[in-house]
């Protein structure tokens, strides 16, 4: 039963939020040479709870709307398959999603009390967007934008809780992380195009079509790379942050693979996986770059 719950929560995709929090903490460490360990633990717990919540509620609503019964599931797309396979009751998944949302909100409320209105604004955005993500947000074509903003706010919020300020470094760091996370959602939406479109969902891929969308792939990594280069050039990021550029070959492999196989689910799966690897490795190297003392 535990394995089923871990599957529906999409544990391996939680790494995106782990990286986002880690970037915020690493930026704080580079600036102040210290972090508050208790606050760091609470931030991780709160962010993980909110991330689990959005995945659970997304699985619930996709099943209720009949999307997951029409998609061809892969390890990267098409939902978790838990509800279509009858492994859990929809009501149980919904209640779990709300429970995690409450847990994350309670932890976030603590930081609102201790750190003020800025965290309150971030928390309010998180709660509303999580609850309405699988209905209002994705139906309006804002899924990729939401994920990018979510990742950015995790970095900014973490840094603010630890340092008491919002800096250009934290904003740029947030952009890097947010766009990398958005890229994973973007490429994973290709196999779900037909099912999503038939049920009224919208995405960037649906808006412009698969062929044109495949050409937009490059925009995401370019934004992240350019942001890092700007940060290094402006002395906001350490020179060693350029280590993230070692993932360029993986990015090129993924982009070319998408361009060639955007309309073939089976052939696209390896390139969805390599895109996930690109995003996570680039993010992890970005974190490490702030911890290396040269």
Predicted segments with their positions:
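Intramembrane alpha-helical segments
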Residues: 4, 79-168
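Membrane-embedded alpha-helical segments that form the functional core of polytopic membrane enzymes
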Residues: 23, 33-57, 120-131, 169-187
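Small-residue-rich segments of transmembrane alpha-helices in multi-pass membrane proteins
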Residues: 18-24, 146-160, 206-210, 273-286
């Amino acid at each position: 039963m535990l394995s089923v719950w871990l599957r529906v929560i999409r544990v391996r995709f939680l790494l995106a939020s782990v990286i986002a929090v880690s970037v915020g903490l690493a930026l704080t460490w580079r600036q102040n040479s210290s972090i508050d360990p208790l606050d760091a633990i609470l931030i991780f717990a709160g962010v993980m709870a909110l991330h689990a919540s959005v995945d659970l509620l997304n699985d619930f609503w996709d099943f209720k709307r009949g999307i997951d019964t029409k998609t061809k599931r892969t390890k990267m797309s098409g939902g978790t398959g838990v509800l279509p396979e009858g492994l859990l009751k929809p009501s149980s998944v919904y209640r779990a999603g709300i429970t995690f949302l409450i847990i994350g909100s309670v932890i976030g409320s603590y930081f609102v009390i201790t750190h003020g209105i800025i965290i309150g604004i971030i928390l309010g955005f998180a709660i509303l967007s999580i609850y309405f993500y699988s209905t209002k947000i994705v139906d309006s074509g804002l899924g990729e934008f939401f994920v990018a903003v979510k990742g950015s706010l995790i970095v900014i919020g973490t840094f603010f809780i630890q340092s008491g300020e919002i800096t250009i470094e934290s904003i740029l760091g947030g952009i890097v992380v947010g766009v990398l996370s958005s890229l994973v959602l973007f490429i994973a939406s290709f196999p779900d195009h037909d099912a999503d479109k038939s049920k009224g969902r919208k995405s960037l891929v649906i808006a412009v079509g698969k062929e044109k969308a495949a050409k937009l792939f490059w925009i995401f990594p370019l934004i992240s790379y350019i942001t890092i280069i700007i940060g290094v050039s402006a002395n906001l990021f350490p020179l060693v942050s350029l280590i993230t550029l070692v993932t360029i070959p993986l990015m090129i492999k993924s982009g070319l693979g998408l361009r060639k196989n955007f309309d073939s689910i089976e052939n696209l799966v390896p390139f969805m996986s390599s895109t996930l690897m690109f995003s996570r490795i680039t993010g992890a190297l970005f974190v490490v770059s702030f911890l290396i003392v040269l």
